[in-house]
Amino acid sequence: MIVELDCGNSFIKWRIIDAFSRVLSSGVVESIEELVHALDEARTSHEFAHCRMVSVRSDDEVARLESVLAQRFGLRVSAVRPASCLAGVRNGYLNHERLGLDRWMAVVAAYRLSAGACLVLDLGTAVTADFVDADGEHRGGFICPGLPLLRRQLREHTRRIHYDAVAANDLTGGSFAPGRSTAEAVERGCVLMLRGFVASQLELAKEYWGDRFEIFLTGGDASLVADVLPRAKVVPDLIFTGLAIACPIPS
């Protein structure tokens, strides 16, 4: 079985797949310790043979995780490295090593799935948008705060905005009428900012390609903007798809 890891800014997503890419087990944790516990439980049902990982964390954190996986599970990790070109996509950054590896994996996966021009949107802790031409040229993209960061900034940098963000998660209720409480006002305002950003990316993609492009949507908050992009393909595991392309397992 193959252990796959997506180590993002806030969470570590993990899953166990078989040789046919069928997902046997998966989860989301906040720390290496929680990951070890989850994999210990998964190991009772599945025998691990390989591990591949994409991470946006520091070199020290990656080295620590690789060491833990080797010592605890006997796994040698195949990790994504920066590249100027991969699977037909040419990295659009002036310094290709500076493009976040999670974005790179999403771009590579989307291009493989579309085989043409595509707009790639990932709504997580940060929100990213990337543009790829039909010939695989990555035009670059945009990064802005995601919903968790928008909430946090308002709570930390204003004196009188205090509310339970967990309890407020459902306060939009599909409505974007002006909020009648601080929590409603913040939640609806932040979601509207995300939706406006996404709409602007759609218009830019149309300027580039007319209607000849596909849209890929991923990330934990993708559902908040899906109706803004009725043509979008929602692919929750887009980064894992890219990971499989970047780090194939020898047969």
Curated annotation (Swiss-Prot):
Quote the record's binding site residues for K(+): D122
Give the catalysed reaction(s), semicolon-separated: (R)-pantothenate + ATP = (R)-4'-phosphopantothenate + ADP + H(+)
One GO molecular function term of this record is: pantothenate kinase activity
The name under which this protein is listed is: Type III pantothenate kinase
Its taxonomic placement starts with: Bacteria, Pseudomonadati, Pseudomonadota, Gammaproteobacteria, Pseudomonadales
Query: What is the gene called?
Result: coaX
Q: Which organism is it from?
A: Azotobacter vinelandii (strain DJ / ATCC BAA-1303)
- UniProt cross-references to Pfam families, sorted A to Z: Pan_kinase
Identify the residues that bind substrate.
Y93, G100, L101, D102, R103, T182
EC number(s) given by UniProt: 2.7.1.33
